[in-house]
Amino acid sequence: MMRADLSKKPGQVSAMFDEVSSAYDRTNTLLSVGNDQLWRVATTRAVAPVAGERILDLAAGTGTSSAALAASGAHVVAADFSEGMLEVGRRRLAGDDRVEFVHADATDLPFDDDSFDAVTISFGLRNVVEPRKGLDELLRVLKPGGRIVICEFSTPPVPLVRRGYDLYMKAVAPSLVKLVSSNASAYEYLNESIQAWPDQETLSSWLRAAGFASVEHRNLTAGIVALHRGVKPAGRHAAPRPAAS
């Protein structure tokens, strides 16, 4: 079983998501007791997509959130490091030209500078090998004045809620996973990655250090999940990327 830390190997993470791709969405709904759908609605509202905008949905997985964003009439680029997840999304959204699926590394995005009106990532930043480098890349591809929205597991501020959540993830969730997935170790990794992830204020500080302004967050479901928002300063353009050696 992979151990959760901040030095994850990209190939391991990608392979893990390839393995669980077929059951990923229904497993998430089961484990979250349906809250994943509420979190998706909150994220879509925070992004506030507008018809004609170009939006990057990073770590898009099977494209469920991408489809919700595209319903506004925006063009959504659904990028992910797992080809297995992308293939499920391509089949599901076949014929919907508002969503474009792209295989991409979050730390080296294959997109031009200043090319998206909004960028968003849900439950994926903690799986990036270098999450702070991922934030740098999101800033680079975002247009000046554009907005970023991050939905990620976080730290419940109330100790009683935190203890109850920890108990659920350690004692209850593993049994539920066995009902719908043959890869229980992937969801053991999920629990460990949540435990290793920094709290709300730390992620806010990372966003500010990357160059985002007007950074704020609000807790969802008692802080089990947090929604972070920020903007790229209007006068800021991407710095030139280093030439390939």
Curated annotation (Swiss-Prot):
Q: What residues bind S-adenosyl-L-methionine, as annotated? A: T62, D80, D105, A106, S122
Query: Which controlled-vocabulary keywords does the entry list?
Result: Menaquinone biosynthesis, Methyltransferase, S-adenosyl-L-methionine, Transferase
Instruction: Name a GO molecular-function annotation.
Output: demethylmenaquinone methyltransferase activity
Query: What is the top-level taxon of the source organism?
Result: Bacteria
Q: Would the keyword rRNA-binding turn up in this protein's UniProt record?
A: no
Pathway stated in the Swiss-Prot or TrEMBL entry:
Quinol/quinone metabolism; menaquinone biosynthesis; menaquinol from 1,4-dihydroxy-2-naphthoate: step 2/2
The family assignment reads: Belongs to the class I-like SAM-binding methyltransferase superfamily. MenG/UbiE family.
PANTHER family, sorted: 2-METHOXY-6-POLYPRENYL-1,4-BENZOQUINOL METHYLASE, MITOCHONDRIAL (PTHR43591:SF24), METHYLTRANSFERASE (PTHR43591)
Role of this protein: Methyltransferase required for the conversion of demethylmenaquinol (DMKH2) to menaquinol (MKH2).
Protein's recorded name:
Demethylmenaquinone methyltransferase
Q: Which organism is it from?
A: Clavibacter sepedonicus
